[in-house]
């Protein structure tokens, strides 16, 4: 919910949408409630031409209240115990996983054990050569060290911003390292193929083994 009204969003859905814009066969996987907002969401997805797998569950469709400060920096009020906290691992979701070449997920959807276990099952069902992109996307206090660590072990591409990198450095016990060395340390420790660091107005950096 933005100041100007309702807008469909979320990092993984945005990823799926932009992948589709490049002509790739992309699917957004989540869950919707049994309510009017879910119907509106489906309508928007279909209008945008975005494929989706979003089972209906007996929880309200998820919403986020977004407020922008004078510089346009957002703050988020993320409603809890909603549909996407309870994504079921259905046969359809499993079939999608088994045919996936790239998957993107974040930390927020893992705040509840139901969706967290579905994400793990999805990742376990993907082909061995699947690109697994963890967009860490820390929000409020909806994350733990264990959840972050588990996803970093399961991904081969990590996307993180400079503020999140500071938090991760503190969390994992290397706060004194500079930004570049933190990235190299994470890249090697988790045997990543790529680490993408975004720095807001200062641009982005891509780290791969032996190269930045």
Q: Predicted segment positions?
A:
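Substrate-binding N-lobe of the ribokinase-like
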Residues: 2-73, 80-87
């Amino acid at each position: 919910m933005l100041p100007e009204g309702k807008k469909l969003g979320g990092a993984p859905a945005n990823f799926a949408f932009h992948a589709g814009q490049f002509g790739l066969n992309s699917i957004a996987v989540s869950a919707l409630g049994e309510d009017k907002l879910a119907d509106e969401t489906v309508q928007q997805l279909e209008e945008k031409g975005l494929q989706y797998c979003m089972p209906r569950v007996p929880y309200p469709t998820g919403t986020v209240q977004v407020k922008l400060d004078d510089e346009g920096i957002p703050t988020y009020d993320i409603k809890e115990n909603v549909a996407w906290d309870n994504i079921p691992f259905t046969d359809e979701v499993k079939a999608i996983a088994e045919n996936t070449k790239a998957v993107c997920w974040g930390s927020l959807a893992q705040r509840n054990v139901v969706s967290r276990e579905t994400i793990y099952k999805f990742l376990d069902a993907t082909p061995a050569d699947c690109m697994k992109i963890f967009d860490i996307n820390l929000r409020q206090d909806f994350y733990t060290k264990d959840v972050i660590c588990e996803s970093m072990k399961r991904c081969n591409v990590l996307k993180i911003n400079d503020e999140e990198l500071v938090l991760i450095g503190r969390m994992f016990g290397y706060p004194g390292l500079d930004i570049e060395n933190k990235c190299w340390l994470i890249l090697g420790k988790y045997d990543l193929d790529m680490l993408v660091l975004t720095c807001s107005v200062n641009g982005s950096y891509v780290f791969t083994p032996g190269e930045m």
